[in-house]
Amino acid sequence: MGNLLSKFRPGCRRRPLPGPGRGAPAPLSRDASPPGRAHSVPTPRPFRGLFRRNARRRPSAASIFVAPKRPCPLPRAAAAPLGVLPAVGWGLAIRKTPMLPARNPPRFGHPSSVRIPPPSRMFTLLLPSPREPAVKARKPIPATLLEETEVWAQEGPRRVKKDEDPVQIEGEDDEKRTPLSSGEASSTSRSQGTQGDVASFRCSPGPLEGNVYHKFSENSMSEKAQASPASSCLEGPAMPSTHSQAGCARHLGKPDPDATAPPEPAVGCSLLQQKLAAEVLNEEPPPSSLGLPIPLMSGKRMPDEKPFCIPPRSAAPPRAARNRPCKRKMSIPLLLPLPPSLPLLWDRGELPPPAKLPCLSVEGDLHTLEKSPEYKRNSRILEDKTETMTNSSITQPAPSFSQPVQTTDSLPLTTYTSQVSAPLPIPDLADLATGPLILPIPPLSTTPKMDEKIAFTIPNSPLALPADLVPILGDQSNEKGGSYNSVVGAAPLTSDPPTPPSSTPSFKPPVTRESPISMCVDSPPPLSFLTLLPVPSTGTSVITSKPMNSTSVISTVTTNASAHLTSQTAVDPEVVNMDTTAPSQVVIFTSSLSSRVSSLPNSQIHCSAEQRHPGKTSVYTSPLPFIFHNTTPSFNQLFGKEATPQPKFEAPDGQPQKASLPSACVFLSLPIIPPPDTSTLVNSASTASSSKPPIETNAMHTTPPSKAVILQSASVSKKYLPFYLGLPGSGNTQPSGNTASVQGSTSLPAQSVRAPATASNHPLNPGATPQPKFGAPDGPQQKTSLPSAHDFLSLPIMVPPDTSTLVSSASAASLSKPAIDTSDMNTTPPSKTVILQSTFVSRKEEYIRFYMGLPGSGNTLHSDSIASAQVSTSFPAQADRRPTTTSSHPLNTGSISHSTLGATDGQQKSDSSFILGNPATPAPVIGLTSPSVQPLSGSIIPPGFAELTSPYTALGTPVNAEPVEGHNASAFPNGTAKTSGFRIATGMPGTGDSTLLVGNTIPGPQVIMGPGTPMDGGSIGFSMSAPGPSSTSGELNIGQGQSGTPSTTSVFPFGQAAWDPTGHSMAAAPQGASNIPVFGYTSAAAYIPGLDPPTQNSCSGMGGDGTRSIVGGPCVPAFQQCILQHTWTERKFYTSSTHYYGQETYVRRHVCFQLP
């Protein structure tokens, strides 16, 4: 086709481009080959050098006419339209030979050959009649609808070939061999097998599809446009009925004396028009509102809004329209068929999903519908889908309904009218997420006839559904694979009756991204309400489920029950009250189980029923538990943050232990996690009295996820608060978090004490802390109460999974897990951690408790930026009968509670409490401790630093503290802190007295933390106190000179000690005096003006003005080594004081250090 089409750029249509040689190009035409030549006329190539230069400055296309080489049967006109083909020489003589340049005169052989201009970017193609490419079938259009269309093509001729190649003729090879003469050109073309196609092209060409950009190539020529010399007569808008010389001359204009008439008769064209017109009527109409054909495949338009098409052979110039008065130039509107609508997916921002219409599946007496055609059609589907209900070996039969029984306690219902239809099959599990919500309702008492509209009632509100209603997911599939999603009965609600005060569950449908739900009834068996639920059994089931999405009600639920009491059962829809909640929410409700169980429709549920025994707890964990309890079928309150947990645990002293939890208790993410293995609760001991209390979830409360509260204890008394119990071999590790925390570790001897060793392990809480009280295990029971302002919202209650090393080589006859009495428990903000801290027995004063411990624990220091403390206790071979309570707590910014440490006999004595330190207003104390002998540096004191005291209950002579009149302790003011580390090596022998905790000297470092006291002249004062008889007072003076050499001081008169010059160890002898080496480690001490501590009055002073006093951390003689880590803000001088409490004496000495 490249040699048949031309590129035009008429000057009247397009503005000539600037520059020399870019005038209006002359139209392109071709001449016929001479009779003796077997090649086709060369086609202009899209190269500039192949054309003559003067061809670009030719006159406009209106004055160009085609001059064939030999006489043409058609008359030639002077103003013939450009691109008119000659009448002869266009048969099958087509060869795929390379094109020759137009400036080669011997090729053309005719003096009147037209010079071909170079191709341009924009050209106009006049289509005499568009047609469709011969891909599958040609779709011609009647000649009455033909119109010439003038379009502008904007692209190059690259993609033209693929639209013209499909119409290549089969007689092409004959043309290469046999040249045609002028007399046999037209007859030869009609004698070929494509004569019908040629006639159809001349008379009524169809719409042309494809790209309009044609590539001028020697390989693309079409016989359909060549076969007839009279095809040039089809340029006009009105097709002549006969193709004669007059008709052609009318369109060609000036006649040619050498032209001859075409030999084709006029009848053949008219018959072809009638035949093709009938074929068009049988085809689909084009998508056009104007009734006009769309000649374009893609409907692409050019900037001038003119659709474009392709001429099969050539096109006439625009100026030739003046010679054709019947021609109309019309831009066919662009009408493209819209692509098939795609389903818009939800959650992608397009449109919400359609409303899922819950259908009430009325299942009752199915005998009335056995003869129904719908029943027979759906019965086959029911048999195929009932086998896909479970994913295990448990068979879950379809729910059966009782005979029609009219009950008097039915709920007020709303009347609906529905068309009688067949009972619906149970949908497959794959349809759970896509189908509407189906709610089975009990059958009515009336039996309707076939194809009769029945009126029955359904609950007006989803919260007032009967107790036996279970939500069913899935849609109803018909025999063709479709779904019955249409609303059969959609009568509006007529009334809103109140809910009767009966024990009915609350049904909450999913509300997230759901459209308004309309109830519809899709099956008409006889309706009747079910009978009452069976009597609750003694078995308790805990059903756990994973989080579900908003479209599904129930996910696959599995319960892992105990191995000895596990029975795989299913949940009967009559006894299970399932509720639909949000994916991240959990519903804990109660339900009774019976011997007759069946499956929940459209949900795979495995329930493990376990028989409850006193003293044993069965709670199964899962991300989303559904807890069923053996009570009357009713929903408990949904969980809420406003509900407060009230668990109550009683001692296992014969009475059944019960954990009472509020009915609104649901854990959002982490449920109660008991130890999975408690068979090794006591090592090498009898577990006759060890038992786990059952947990009753009717009082359980919820806690936010990722928070936890650790409560563990091994007390004997009923009312003991279960703190963290640390015994030897437990492998406790220090917490590693930004929040300060403590950890206790207790090492028991071979013969352990009868009393439990309780250690409290809690991170610090900036708020108020609880005040637990510890009493004797064999005396009056002391109740553990927590302040009402505390709640364990941060972390759920958890128990260590392994307690095999809870007691080592000891009898566990008196050991048991105490119950938790949370009657006084309260809530706190979720982001806070509860610190359970013991209190002092102080009748009139409050003290800030510090650090207490014994050597030999090998504890490690917490590595957080926030201060923390660590406790360790080592018992001798001959331990005391009294319980040893080690409390380790970091100091917080809020008020710190105090603990009461009572005697072993349970009686609070005047000397049963040991108080150290001056009375002071509670203030935050933060610091870091280290078990090594090397001091730490970098500790920073927060604002409001105060004194530290340490309780000690195991010493023989505790002091009941009564502060001296008029004495007050001072605190450091707010300001920038500085650090300085000191190491004090002390030693104390053991006398073997049962009143002393340490019977023998136990090696190992011990850590104590306390603030240094800045004094005048660059000294640091540190306070140390020790209990003793009323006539005994201890004093320890530690100093350091400018040279840095250690100084010696006298130790308490408990014994005489000989110190090692290295300061790392020392030996002590009782009832003597010894010197203790003191090594001072200071760091970057600087004076900060304007930060003076408050002036205080003191009883006595040493080496100072006696006007200011501040207390540091204590150092009890029982410690083998004391590593002092303190912080100060100024260098001031402070005094010491002595307190007298009745017949007992409490001595406090301030040790001064001289700073460089």
UniProtKB/Swiss-Prot annotation:
Can you quote a single GO CC term? nuclear inner membrane
Asked whether the UniProt record includes Nucleus among its keywords, one would answer: yes
* GO BP, sorted A to Z: cell differentiation; protein import into nucleus; RNA export from nucleus; spermatogenesis
Residue ranges for the region (Disordered) are 1-60, 155-204, 219-266, 481-515, 680-703, 732-786, 872-915, 1026-1046
Q: Which UniProt keywords apply?
A: Developmental protein, Differentiation, Membrane, Nucleus, Spermatogenesis
The record gives the effect of mutating R37Q as: In a colorectal cancer sample; somatic mutation
| InterPro entries found in the cross-reference section | Nucleoporin
Where is the protein found, in the record's own terms? Nucleus, Nucleoplasm; Nucleus inner membrane
What terms describe the molecular function in GO for this protein? nuclear localization sequence binding; structural constituent of nuclear pore
Q: Where is the composition biased (Polar residues)?
A: 179-197, 219-231, 680-692, 732-750, 884-915, 1028-1046
Q: Where is the composition biased (Basic residues)?
A: 50-59
Basic and acidic residues bias locations = 156-165
Give the primary localization class. Answer: nucleus
Query: According to its UniProt record, in which tissues is this protein expressed?
Result: Testis-specific in adults. In fetal brain expressed only from the paternal allele.
Subunit-level organization: Associates with the nuclear pore complex (NPC).
What function is annotated for this protein? May be involved in spermatogenesis.
Q: What is this protein called?
A: Nuclear pore-associated protein 1
Q: Which organism is it from?
A: Homo sapiens (Human)
Q: Write the lineage as a comma-separated list.
A: Eukaryota, Metazoa, Chordata, Craniata, Vertebrata
Instruction: Give the gene name.
Output: NPAP1
